[in-house]
Amino acid sequence: MEAIKRMNVEENDFKQLFWQISPKEISDNMFTLVMDNFYVITAGNEAHYNSMIGSGGGFGLLFRKPASWCVIRTDRYTLELIQKEQTYTIAYFSDRYKEQLLFLGSQSGRDSRKMEEVELTGIQTPSGNMSFKEARLIFECKLTQITTPDLDDFCTQEARDYIADAYQKASDYRKYVFG
């Protein structure tokens, strides 16, 4: 049964696998979705794209519109592609793809052929963004803002301690990406 399902995924196009819904129709508990799952951030175009795993972020309203935010290290190749394309996707998967998601997080797409080696099937959305056929939920995001948090921006000592510990080297610095 698994092989048949996988074969069908590979043979179908985006419109056969996914349908557009409004953010209000998402039935997942958003805290569970973000806290208990890795997700994949993908940017680029059909000719060249890159993905990385994310493990923090959230969803809500920004400028009266549905928005997402994720945290990306400044040295990530995916961040370069987000800045270039001004769009990206966030995709969630069932647990059976965890090994492949960890593979996407294990090496840089700048220095490897991981997008060719990963056992997930790339798919272009109708908007021209890239994601994967095996995803169970895809968010298409238009870049709104990229910002760097400053230690003085945080009000609690717990947050300040976290940021001070997380940013010990320049390569550790992270950008907050809103879309």
Give the ranges of each region predicted by the language model.
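Basic, polyanion-binding surface patches
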Residues: 2-179
